[in-house]
Amino acid sequence: EDLAAVLGPKLDVSRGDLNRTSLSLQTIRLPSQAERLAWLAEQLATLQGHGIIYTLTVRDANQVAQWLKTQGFNVEAYTGETGDRREQLEQALLNNQVKALVATTALGMGYDKPDLAFVIHYQMPGSVVAYYQQVGRAGRALDSAYGVLLSGQEESDITDWFIRSAFPTRQEVADVLGALEDEPNGLSVP
């Protein structure tokens, strides 16, 4: 009813089961990055198929990918800084040419690999919605897939930084408003 009030009366509502019996979910608390890296190196060798390892930052995606490469895994980092290689890396995962992409949210909506066998979160995502969307990529066309959420101590610092950075400070807003009020002919951005 709330959505119909906002979007209008010609709204079709589809309801479905959110439960995915093919997807096994697990949370593992490993406070230090060293513990999580060791866990990844140990477990990645036992996981069948190919998948995505999500990180919160570009730095962590690069660090995790580099570590796994030193352990003999065929993985690649995929971030907002990947640039021209994005399509090539997406195709490599699609064609099972890499064990995993170690990715930030840059590997987001629109990427579809029905036989994705696992999604591992190196850190807790910023929201439940982000987690659900990312982990839901696994096992769409498989009888069995895994979603593993690794949780560590630096997450709150990263999340707090994202929250603090999301909005301008009071002083920044006051400065912009002051500049607009002081300019008799208004301001425009070139």
Located regions from the model:
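Short acidic, hydrophobic short linear motifs in intrinsically disordered regions
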Residues: 176, 183-190
